[in-house]
Structure formats: C-alpha cells, structure tokens
Amino acid sequence: MKNKSFMDYRKIVMEVCCGSWRSAVKAIEDGAERIELCQALSVDGLTPSMNVLRRLRAKYPGVRIHFLIRAREGDFVYDDDEVAIMEADIREAVEAGASAIVCGALTPDNDIDTAAMRRWIAAAQGLPVTFHRAFDHVRDPQAALEQLIELGVARVLTTGGRMPDGTIATTAEEGIPALRALVEQAAGRIIIMPGCGVNNDNARRIIEETGAREVHGTKLNKKIWQKQNGLAAS
C-alpha cells in the first residue's frame, strides 16, 4: 500500500502560476513541469505578452506552457467584441507556442457562456483548454461541470466554487468538500485542478482529501514538496 501511495504521488502534476518573465524562468529553472503564464496577478491574472511566450518557448522548448486568456479585470461576462478579441488572442497564442489555453466566460446569470467557449475552443485548434476560476462563480457547479465536459474542456481550475451553504470558497483548502464532490462527479471525464492558496505545506492535504491529481499555485515547487513529504523526485 505504501508503494502504491508513493507511485501515485510521483504522478501528481504541480502547475506553477507565473505572472512575469522572471517568475516563469525561476519556476522552470527550479524544475516546474508545467506553468501557467499570465500577468497582473493582483487582479487574478490577465493575458500576458505574446513575446514573453515566444521567448520562453524558444528558450525552453520542452516545457508545458499553459497560456491565460483574459482581456480585462472584473467579471467574466463579455460582449461580442471582447469575445472576438480573446478569440484572436487564442489564435496568436497557438502560433506562438502555447501548450494549452486557459480561459472562461459566464452569462449574466452566472452560467457557462457556451457560445463564447465554443468559439475559443475552436480557436485553440486542438490544444487542451482549461476553464479558469470563473467556475468559482457559477450558480450551479454540477450542471456547469457537465456542460464543460460536453464542450470538451480538459480541466477546471477552481477553489471548489459554490459551497453547499451558498458561499463561495476563497481558497482551495476552504473548498475541500466542494472539490471532493467535483472530483467524484468528474469521474475521470475532466480534470479538477484545485487552485488559490495551494502551496508546498498544504498541497498534500488538498490532494489526499479531494482526490485531485493536479494542483495549481504561485508558491509550488515539486522537488521541495517531495522532499518535505519523504518522496523520491520524479
């Protein structure tokens, strides 16, 4: 049983959220297997420079770079022009070497904007798509998850979102019960990736209590995490 747990932990994916060229380089040099590239983390991330993506891809051709598409801060309800702008950004990111696209849109009623998502998924030209933390604000997480599965979205980045009492989890630790329910509902059809406040100290608890196999954070280092937990480096 111990060996099974060991092997499972070696397969955990830690995605490091990087808000600049320097933070991306540091994460990669520290051994990050995958990064999410964005900017303006103070407003929960915006679309970063395409030239940063191009330079990272040239310098680190083997690193998986998930690229955030978010045109502005604030809510996730976008008009037709904003949808078109982000559609064009996705196409450019694909050409610039992104490994996957991170995006998300909601309707005014806080449901998944399936029309926008279909356009963006098509623009991704077969690259995996992550639905970002707009998911935290959907009014019906279970129904929204089924919609994303039907759309072909690869993963959802979330704190767990809306809790049974109607409040929205502000961190992944707080949202553990909701995350566990989402992982169970997903049943391998889509990846549930806990994010917000995930670090080397609490990642193991979040993984064990939710069943998630990918986590996301700005302060993750898999090598340090494995050492802290007595696990061999992968």
How should these model regions be labeled?
Residues 54-92:
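Structural motif corresponding to the early beta-alpha repeats
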Residues 21-22, 41-64, 81-82, 106-125, ...:
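Active-site-adjacent beta->alpha loops and helix N-cap segments on the catalytic face
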Residues 2-17, 58:
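N-terminal amphipathic alpha-helix/helix-capping segment at the start of soluble metabolic enzymes
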Residues 13-25, 30, 36-40, 44-45:
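N-terminal beta1-alpha1 ligand-phosphate binding loop
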Residues 12-16, 35-37, 65-69, 101-103, ...:
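Hydrophobic faces of well-ordered beta-strands that scaffold small-molecule active sites
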Residues 19-26, 30, 77-89, 136-151, ...:
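Catalytic cores of alpha/beta
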Residues 30-35, 60-63, 97-100, 123-127, ...:
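Glycine-enriched alpha-helix->loop->beta-strand junction motifs that scaffold or abut catalytic
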Residues 36-46, 92, 96-108, 153-169, ...:
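Glycine-rich phosphate-binding active-site loops on the catalytic face of alpha/beta enzymes
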